[in-house]
Swiss-Prot record:
Keywords: Hydrolase, Lipid A biosynthesis, Lipid biosynthesis, Lipid metabolism, Metal-binding, Zinc. Zn(2+) binds at residues 75, 232, 236. The gene is lpxC. It comes from the Bacteria. InterPro entries: Ribosomal_Su5_D2-typ_SF, UDP-acyl_GlcNac_deAcase, UDP-acyl_GlcNac_deAcase_C, UDP-acyl_N-AcGlcN_deAcase_N. The active site is at 259 (proton donor). Belongs to the LpxC family. GO terms for biological process: lipid A biosynthetic process. GO terms for molecular function: metal ion binding; UDP-3-O-acyl-N-acetylglucosamine deacetylase activity. This is UDP-3-O-acyl-N-acetylglucosamine deacetylase.
Length: 294
């Protein structure tokens, strides 16, 4: 099984969730072993997608350094993971990725337009060898060894609309596109004014966010799935784990997880060299792992 990149360059435009300004995005092919690289064209600054470059996880996953930052990368990273793409350059002319419709389906469409091609180098994956867990009170995220990677996610909100939701996701591109990619980000009406006073969520609207009041959803079209909230948290988690630089071959379990806990988990994994193995998918080893790339 070979590493993948794009066949051709594709461009798009969307609104930034936090600043509310139009953002141009370009996805470009990269050579083997380059990884996922973000580039701020307005700053002439590159940022490798990796846990060590994460500087903030409060409202989104943010890469950066003293030159600047790029926010809200997780939806795009999630789609890149689902398509099995190992090497890609993401060019942005602003400090955040566009939110599109609040899900990752627009990025999936961009990847479909770009096409995917093999490179002359074996694909590598990260195989989890022992359990790694991060907790914050009763909240936790965990990776454990497995032969068939799944995400088991539970959320619980003190809100009549959301309540407690659980979803079990089995890895495959087809399953992702059908059941995860269209799940949108969500927020609470009571938080909107506070966020905007901090110059956040200025681009948020019913076009790109599920807005929840105490006992109703404000979006006139309603939900895309009855459990869209937990499905979106899975979308986010996939994007956050992609910062490890490889498709992770392990079970991920979360109760009330977050970008912050996901970031701490990636750091804990990399800290313990016995917790994982980087496996090169040569012909002799790929059969046990190829199902997740279907």
């Amino acid at each position: 099984m070979k590493q993948l990149t794009l066949v051709k360059t594709v461009k798009g435009v969307g609104i930034g969730l936090h600043k509310g300004e139009p953002i141009e995005i370009t996805l470009e092919p990269l050579e083997a072993n380059s990884g996922i690289v973000f580039f701020r064209s307005d700053l002439n600054a590159s940022y490798k997608a990796s846990p060590e470059n994460v500087i903030n996880t409060q409202m989104a996953t943010v890469l950066g350094d003293d030159r600047g930052f790029i926010s809200t990368i997780e939806h795009l990273m999630s789609a890149i993971n689902a398509y099995g793409i190992d090497n890609v350059r993401i060019v942005l002319n602003a400090n955040e990725a566009p939110v599109m419709d609040g899900s990752s389906i627009s990025f999936c469409m961009m990847l479909d337009e770009a096409g995917v091609k093999e490179l002359d180098a074996p694909k590598k994956i990260m195989v989890i060898k022992k359990p790694i867990e991060v907790r914050d009170g009763n909240k936790f995220v965990r990776l454990t060894p497995t032969k068939e990677p799944r995400i088991n996610y539970t959320i619980k909100f003190d809100n009549a609309v959301i309540g407690e939701q659980s979803y079990n996701f089995e890895f495959s591109k087809k399953n992702y596109i059908e059941n995860i990619a269209r799940a949108r980000t969500f927020g609470f009406l009571k938080d909107v004014q506070a966020l905007r006073s901090m110059n956040l969520a200025l681009g948020g609207s019913l076009e790109n966010t599920i807005v929840v009041d105490e006992n109703r959803i404000l979006n006139p079209e309603g939900l895309r799935f009855k459990d869209e909230f937990v499905r979106h948290k899975i979308l986010d988690a996939i994007g956050d784990l992609t910062l490890l630089g490889y498709r992770v071959f392990g079970d991920y379990t979360s109760y009330a997880g977050s970008h912050h806990l996901n970031h701490l988990l990636t750091k804990e994994v990399l800290k313990d060299k016995d917790a994982y193995e980087i496996v090169s998918l040569e012909k002799t080893t790929q059969k046990a792992y190829e199902k997740v790339f279907a």
